[in-house]
């Protein structure tokens, strides 16, 4: 018995190592494809922009007024036409949709929604709307991971792993921060850290970063060479307190503006999108720096090439406009713009405290980290992103300070979760699954499945006698197109009646005498289904159909028997 237990444990470990290797290979493939897809997405967005803007593709303020207004109006009208023609099921895009599909549809992300996300986000970004590319990148990466998992027929934990690989790969390719990409997948999408997913997700993230770096080039938002060391003085922390207060104000403004606009989702697409076009067009005339993602404005402010008459006004308007644009349903991201808003806020605080150029860069980084952490409740992602961007740990203490304070204040005083969690909550959905659901999702049907023998309806008597030495308890045979289940013991009991004389179920075929199972036995019809990806799907099937047993297809010619009773016993045992 001990030998059998050791063998069982060893084979279980071997299977887990095989699963890890398969997931690592698929994760690497997911990272490769995510990197290529993000490079293509980048080209689709920025090549047309460079045609009419020039090398500085995010510099919409350099365009004539009529061009700025024309681009905004044209982009909004094209988006309104597209979304008014598409069925409503294809309108769902972005990070909240990814979390919804993960929690309510086992991570199954339709391809066509990703296609809509790709082109609609590209149109919005090219036209200068105040949105980002990072949210759409998450949707595209997650869809790619889910597609690979579906084609590989992975169980549910494998689907979730590749989903995380796709998200991490996409974020890593966009920001070129591989570790921050991994943490983003766990903190923002899964809302928990999952140790068993780490290796494949890390591999995907690193490969996507390498692909992005080689195809796009370095994506340095601004020069950080001036940061060599940080003096942890009291003046620094006074300034950090001021920065946190400003960031929390901006985060609350950003979130509450969106919340107030979610109530307008009942308006027509034309009304909402043209409203965005009108407001953005007016701002494009008087404050063109608010157009686009804002990366170039931040970079120019730090280098001294751009001077705005009121940086504070720019920050407030950019915050409200981004929330306004996203809140009314424009299919873009909010991660990039909030990152830039935080950077601008950091520069504003640095100017108030009359800091030098090096401190301006430092506070821009701190503002970016604090804003990301406060809006998306992703403290580790924000912290690690800053460390990876600076290639230095010298900023870690002030970054920790502002990130933790910003997150705490948003949670404790404003009672606000991540903007994505708040969006799902507004829609009446949960952003997490219960521990019981998670347990079911992380197990396949193998622990509750029993082997069965698949035999024809007519079986030679000699073969029936051989069943006495079999260790399998159940036999399945077909009557027409239906599968019927019978216990092996019942077959042997029927066979023993031959000692009493000829039986009605005997059938002669040439020189062979066979048993007709349909006449000899009282069998139970049992349906056949494809193997579910998790015990959650299996339990859902039993609850829906109310049947006690089902055959699960293992291969084209073999089945396993799963019973509701055995499933309940497994769940009760797991609670002990």
Task: Name these PLM-found stretches.
Residues 483-490, 558-564:
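Amphipathic coiled-coil signal-relay and dimerization helices
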Residues 504-517:
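Acidic/proline- and glycine-rich, intrinsically disordered low-complexity segments
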Residues 445-447, 517-522:
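Short, conserved catalytic or adaptor-binding loops enriched in Gly and charged residues
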Residues 1-442, 446-475, 480-481, 487-507, ...:
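Alpha-helical transmembrane segments and immediately membrane-proximal extracytoplasmic
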Residues 509, 519, 523-576:
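Cytosolic regulatory modules rich in charged/polar residues
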């Amino acid at each position: 018995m001990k030998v059998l237990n050791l063998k069982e444990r060893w084979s279980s470990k071997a299977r887990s190592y095989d699963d890890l290797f398969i997931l690592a290979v698929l994760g690497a493939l997911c990272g490769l494809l995510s990197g290529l897809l993000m490079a293509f997405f980048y080209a689709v967005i920025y090549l047309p922009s460079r045609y009419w803007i020039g090398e500085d593709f995010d510099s919409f303020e350099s365009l004539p007024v009529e061009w700025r207004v024309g681009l905004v109006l044209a982009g909004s009208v094209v988006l309104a036409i597209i979304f008014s023609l598409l069925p409503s099921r294809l309108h769902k895009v972005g990070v909240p949709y990814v979390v919804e599909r993960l929690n309510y549809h086992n991570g199954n992300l339709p391809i066509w929604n990703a296609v809509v996300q790709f082109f609609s986000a590209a149109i919005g970004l090219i036209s200068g709307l105040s949105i980002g590319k990072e949210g759409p990148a998450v949707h595209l990466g997650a869809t790619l991971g889910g597609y690979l998992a579906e084609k590989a027929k992975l169980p549910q934990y494998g689907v979730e792993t590749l989903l995380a690989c796709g998200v991490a790969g996409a974020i890593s390719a966009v920001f070129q921060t591989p570790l921050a990409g991994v943490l983003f997948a766990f903190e923002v999408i899964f809302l928990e850290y999952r140790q068993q997913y780490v290796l494949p997700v890390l591999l995907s993230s690193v490969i996507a970063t390498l692909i992005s770096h080689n195809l796009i080039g370095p994506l340095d938002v601004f020069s950080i060479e001036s940061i060599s060391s940080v003096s942890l003085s009291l003046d620094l922390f006074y300034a950090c307190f001021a920065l946190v207060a400003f960031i929390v104000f901006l985060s609350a403004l950003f979130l509450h503006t969106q919340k107030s606009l979610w109530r307008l989702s009942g308006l027509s697409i034309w009304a909402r999108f043209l409203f965005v076009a009108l407001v953005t067009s007016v701002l494009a005339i008087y404050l063109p720096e608010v157009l686009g993602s804002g990366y170039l404005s931040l970079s120019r402010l730090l280098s001294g090439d751009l001077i705005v008459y009121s940086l504070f006004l720019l920050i407030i308007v950019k915050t409200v406009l981004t929330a306004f644009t996203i809140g009314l349903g424009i299919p873009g991201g909010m991660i990039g713009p909030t990152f830039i808003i935080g950077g601008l806020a950091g520069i504003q605080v640095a100017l108030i405290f009359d800091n030098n150029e090096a401190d301006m860069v430092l506070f821009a980084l701190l503002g970016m980290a604090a804003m990301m952490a406060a809006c998306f409740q992703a403290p580790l992602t924000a912290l690690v992103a800053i460390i990876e961007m600076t290639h230095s740990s010298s900023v870690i203490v002030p970054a920790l300070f502002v990130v933790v304070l910003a997150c705490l204040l948003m949670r404790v005083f404003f009672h606000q979760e991540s903007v994505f969690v708040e969006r799902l909550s507004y829609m009446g959905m949960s952003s997490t699954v219960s521990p019981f659901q998670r347990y079911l999702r992380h197990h396949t049907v193998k622990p509750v499945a029993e082997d069965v023998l698949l035999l024809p309806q007519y079986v030679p008597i000699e073969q029936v006698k051989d069943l006495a030495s079999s260790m399998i308890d159940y036999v399945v045979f077909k009557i027409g197109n239906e599968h019927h289940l019978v216990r092996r013991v019942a077959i042997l009991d029927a066979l023993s009646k031959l000692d009493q004389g000829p039986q009605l179920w005997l059938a002669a075929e040439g020189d062979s005498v066979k048993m007709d199972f349909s006449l000899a036995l009282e069998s139970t019809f049992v349906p056949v289904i494809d193997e579910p990806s998790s015990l959650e799907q299996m339990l859902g099937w039993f609850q829906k159909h109310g049947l006690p047993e089902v055959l699960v297809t293992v291969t084209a010619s073999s089945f396993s028997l799963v019973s509701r009773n055995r499933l309940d016993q497994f769940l009760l045992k797991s609670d002990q």
